[in-house]
Regions:
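Glycine-rich phosphate/adenylate-binding loop
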Residues: 41, 46-54, 59-186
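Short, solvent-exposed polar/charged micro-motifs at secondary-structure junctions
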Residues: 28-33, 175-179
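A short coil-to-beta-strand element that immediately follows conserved catalytic motifs
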Residues: 16-22, 161-164
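Conserved SAM/SAH-binding loop
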Residues: 20-30, 38
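Glycine-rich phosphate-binding loop and adjoining beta1-alpha1-beta2 segment
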Residues: 1-17
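Charged/polar, solvent-exposed surface patches and flexible loops
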Residues: 7, 11, 32, 66, ...
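Conserved amphipathic alpha-helix within the SDR
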Residues: 34-42
């Protein structure tokens, strides 16, 4: 799935999109993957131009979210979109770091209890444990993925995403979005 999505985004938006067909379970690897490259700018006003990296946390456990949170806090500039859902409900949070400052809280800042969770990485679970760990419905997964795509689309096409967080329930067919408060968006 990751390979196909990366290839589609790269083709449609004429940009570089990377994927890794493996679990990332250490901070050094993740930090290396999200490092923004830079190059000399054409204008004196912008002597150095940096890539804008978007980390999409499509993970199914809090230990992986804790790792993404640590990488977010170490990053100079990063957009971190995290989607999480259970069987019928979930949320998508867009965190932003700019020039070493947190402009918008990431998922760990919005839901600090997940930073204390004691679960395991997917590679540490047996097949039986993994299948029982967190029941999810196809509708909740599709809803979370659609919100992530909308956020990324707005960043790539419109240059910003004004949505900080979207909570949803597929059982009650409800969606609620918290917008930026007249500050620069992602």
């Amino acid at each position: 799935k990751a390979k196909i999505l990366a290839e589609r985004y790269a083709a449609v938006f004429g940009m570089e999109a990377e994927y890794l067909p493996a679990f990332v379970e250490d901070l050094d690897t993740l930090t290396t993957l999200i490092h923004a490259d830079g190059w000399a700018g054409e204008y004196s006003r912008y002597p150095t131009v940096r890539e804008q990296v978007i980390l999409i946390g499509a993970v199914d456990n809090d230990k992986s979210r804790q790792l993404c949170h640590k990488a977010f806090l170490k990053a100079e500039n990063l957009i971190y979109i995290d989607s999480g859902n259970g069987e019928f409900s979930g949320q998508v949070v867009c965190g932003v770091r700019r020039n070493g400052r947190t402009i918008r809280k990431p998922v760990g800042g919005v839901f600090p209890e997940l930073l204390k969770a004691q679960d395991r990485f997917p590679s540490e679970l047996s097949c039986a444990e993994a299948s029982l760990a967190d029941p999810q419905s196809m509708a909740a997964n599709i809803t979370a993925a659609t919100i992530v795509v909308d956020m990324v689309y707005n960043i790539l096409v419109n240059g910003e995403c004004s949505a900080r967080q979207t909570d949803f329930s597929t059982k009650t067919v409800r969606m609620s979005t918290t917008l930026d408060k007249n500050r620069s968006a992602a």
